[in-house]
């Protein structure tokens, strides 16, 4: 299963690692490069981008994703905007 996780904080990072260990293809997305660097060798792909910028989504394989998880916890506004953009751009199951 191809899963994209937005937000690589404590929850998002541990979820990405667990889902990878169970055989899923996981793409992790965060706006902080240090978090991307921490996980980039442990999951399929890690991308540094601002998920509130709709134009940044061109780099993501959203159409191929089975599930999209929004794990942005510290910025509620960013989580809502990210969820709205994802809903507009793909038909994957969204967990937010």
What kind of region is each of these model predictions?
Residues 1-96:
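Cytosolic regulatory regions of ion transport systems
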